[in-house]
Amino acid sequence: MRRTTALAMTAPALGLVAALTLAPPASAGSATTHASLRPVNDHNASGQAFVDVKGNRITVTMAAHGLVPNQPHAAHIHFGAEARHECPVMADDTDGNHHISTTEGVPAYGPVVVSLTTFGPTDPGSALAIDRFDTAPRGKLQYERGGIKVSHAVARAIESGEAVVVVHGVDYNHTAAYDAGGPSDLDPSLPAEATDPAICGVLDVVDGHGGH
């Protein structure tokens, strides 16, 4: 199991780190995990995500900046037993268009296991529920949702450093809108900019906040 130290983190929202630092050590069957969200597709955005696991329930807190403003940003937790458990790199660009699509990233991070919607279902079936994701006012995303039910396998993957947080939505042509990149590989009625990954990070257990 990989671990990360709370003191080594930087976050766009200092409150996230403060809350984590003041939290008591995790008890058996629970863990606090953290991911530094870094750019994919040369997108100028970054962020932090924390996922608290208690049994088969999770609480997700996420902050990011530099996203396409006032546009929906689908966000998910990904996991696949056969995946590399990491964020994609340009070598995953199999069609040679110099962009990494969501599908091209699957060998790295696996399929969607949790949809980080603002309300309603959070299952993989909501992966493209564009009307239920954060819209990043002024390019900033602030997200918190608790009580999300996951399977034992997904909870274990999060605690074991095998789950990946991905936020989608990029702006290749700098128009502040989703209108380029061709059709999405997930839904041809959407432009690729709407669904290509923007930022990504692997969830690792924070020192002193993990247990089984």
For the regions a protein language model found, what residue spans apply to each?
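N-terminal leader/targeting pre-sequences
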Residues: 2-7, 12-19, 24-212
